[in-house]
């Protein structure tokens, strides 16, 4: 069975495979010559990107009937990798693990080519809890740093702001953007660059390709089509830079095709992209909560609750209230509001309103961006601090 570890660049896939897993195997008694490690991103291994060369090399390393562990990093750099992996599957004494940084070429293939013979393990940047295990300051200072520079493991090795900023900017430009341009042969890259800026400036905002195309036309004087914008967004999603969250009609029990919300999988990369401007903590916290829920394995949608209100003329009108997150994992479901501050009765009423219109028995929560005790009001709505949510594994059950 093929085990595929997917996730964004520099989130720790290689370290997991080549260091932690290799150490585990050796400590379990596996001989080092039965662990075949190939890093396809390493220039000295460029010849291995040819399927014939790679297959021949692995075949030459297998000299007995004992089990061999084949570990391949950045497998999407291998031409015709599906054929090669299928070849390894036919060997009776191999156990294959690969990593990859492009969902289009990996997740889809696992679901089709390797159905029943492979599974995907999604890897994310460090959670805040993991981040704090290596951070020496207070949770409050740690959260500020985490929201500013993100959770890529390497960021913790830099001691100065300048080094952190340079690392993130260089990673975005020289790795992510270059990879997308090269992989999809994008020559007119100005629109792609501008699209990334727009999405980074509007995290958590509802939008769609048609709306974005109109923005390009009116503000950027660009004739880019909505189909091209959709392709570019797909490329960004496939590279694990952003994720799309779909709206769900809670009462109608159906998905709404458009518009969508887009969240950056690492806030540090998002912030570096826009030169650490537009640092509204309301939006950063919403993105942070989304990421934490995804790390915990939840499917996360945007909730829509249709309501009827009375306008100033006394007439009924239809409108919609929004639940920030509907989180589903197996039989579990939670409705969650993100509120950086609730300093007035009006703000409390505003955050509660969508949750009160949800008439099922699943748990309803407000996550507050400051320290506060866990409370449950007369409507059954739990309020919890962002620190408890991020640092306690059982936070959703409090």
Give residue ranges: language-model regions.
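Conserved P-loop NTPase "ATPase switch" module shared by AAA+ and STAND
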Residues: 63-81
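Short regulatory helix/loop adjacent to the ATP-binding pocket of P-loop NTPases
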Residues: 87, 104-119, 134-136
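A cross-kingdom feature that marks ATP-driven nucleic-acid transaction machinery
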Residues: 1, 6, 15-16, 22-23, ...
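Conserved ATPase-coupling elements of RecA-like P-loop NTPase cores
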Residues: 47-50, 76-85, 108-110
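Interdomain hinge/linker elements that couple catalytic modules in large macromolecular machines
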Residues: 124, 129-306, 318
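Structural recognition of the conserved hydrophobic beta-strand(s) that form the central parallel beta-sheet
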Residues: 95-101, 122
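Conserved glycine(s) of the Walker
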Residues: 12
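Short glycine-rich substrate-engagement loop in P-loop NTPases that contacts/grips substrate
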Residues: 36-65
